[in-house]
């Protein structure tokens, strides 16, 4: 048996070995599903300036990593989630800031901002948020209230009509 000293992903012409940056912008959620332990509504939202500084620092770090990667592998996914990310009172500002902060790196590496969300926000907020995303991961919650499910469907339709990429997951128990 060969002596394996290192394990690396196998790259093919179709494989793009990117970089995943997880950004949990809040622990709070506007739902209280029986199957979810991923939120804490007792904990306050992180301060807007702290979030902005953390994002700026993370992008600087990513830029350093991207400098040593092959040009064809310089791709970053910023996974924005929470509790429920859209429940953060400053999420529109933070997403807009993500666009501004990324501008200085745009010519060096690509960024896909992916929001994982229950999509329960109102129409105006959704339109503002969508401007600063490349991908939306919709999380449908079977236990969610009816009105918020209507918002989910409306926001899913708006995302589809915008031409943005999206996917979905259905959350239920049992």
Model region roles, listed by residue range:
Residues 1-22, 68-72:
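N-terminal [4Fe-4S]-dependent radical SAM core
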Residues 1-13, 35-37, 110, 133-135:
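Short charge-dense sequence patches
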Residues 10-53:
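Canonical Radical SAM [4Fe-4S] cluster-binding loop centered on the CxxxCxxC motif
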Residues 55-79, 88-174:
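Radical SAM/AdoMet-radical enzyme domain recognition
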Residues 82-83:
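Active-site beta-strand/loop signature of hydrolases that rely on acidic residues for catalysis
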